[in-house]
Amino acid sequence: MPCSLMKVDAKIVRLLVVVILLARVAPALAAGCSPAVASRSAQLHLAAVTAPGTVDVTFLGHASFFLQSPGGVKIVTDYNDYIRPDFTPDVATMNHAHPTHYSLDPDPGIKLILRGWDTGTGIPHFHERFGDVQIRNVATNIREWGGGTEYGGNSIFVFEIADLCIAHLSHLHHTLAPEHLAELGEIDVLIAPVDGAYTLGQRDMLEVIRQVKAPLTIPMHFFTPRVLENFLTLIASQYPVQRAGGSHVTLSRAMLPRVPTILVIAPERGG
């Protein structure tokens, strides 16, 4: 074979190798928590119908949210014995700052229960795959009732669903250190407690929202409408506020706003 043809054949082989490698890498990049943001629209649009590439989000109450993936995986955050869904989720996450964030008697039909604190085997570090959902956690500390600190007593759970990264802060008691932010990665939707008392002061929670820089933040854990409105007044000059007009929204990457926005979802039962 002439040398010129051999050179062409070698180039073709190298090109094919590159194409194969890219094909293998692309799905992993799409599933990660640092996706490109160029496709974010200028305005958040709320949908009411589940579709491929979307996440159904329902605010059950207090710190419990029901997330449903395109593949039908049902997740309930801060699953507890006070505000329970009328169905059995596939996955339940819990934290233990207060009994309203965990259950002593979870539904035996739940397939995966993730307790976000040290239950006797050390601070948990979850990396779980369930159906089309990836779940991990970032451990944080909480104040103890008698004073002092319980290290790793709370977990920020991160749910990677439909090309969105959703972080639920649960009962966060402090602003985030650089190592927490590095573990979190790029977050698209932040669910944040705004009570201003049992977790963080509202100004400190505002600082956490600034730290995370999520396009969308959903307030939770506010107990009463007045507490929520106090928080919205505090942030009014810094973030636009949209109200869902109900307890349910459907989110997708294309719906994320370019400007960081606060989205208020009404709890089904108690804030």
Where are the predicted features?
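Histidine-centered divalent metal-coordination motifs
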Residues: 90-110, 221
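Proline-aspartate-enriched helix->loop->beta-strand connector
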Residues: 189, 196, 205-219
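Bacterial N-terminal signal peptides that target proteins for export
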Residues: 3-16
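Extracytoplasmic/secreted cell-surface and envelope-processing proteins
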Residues: 102-103, 176-178, 198-203, 226-230
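N-terminal signal peptide c-region/cleavage motif recognized by signal peptidases
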Residues: 25-26
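Short, aromatic/basic amphipathic alpha-helical patches
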Residues: 106-107, 227-238
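Short, conserved loop/helix-junction motifs that constitute active-site signature segments
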Residues: 84-87, 105-110, 183-186, 208-213
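Core dinuclear metal-dependent hydrolase active-site scaffold
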Residues: 31-91, 99, 115-185, 189, ...
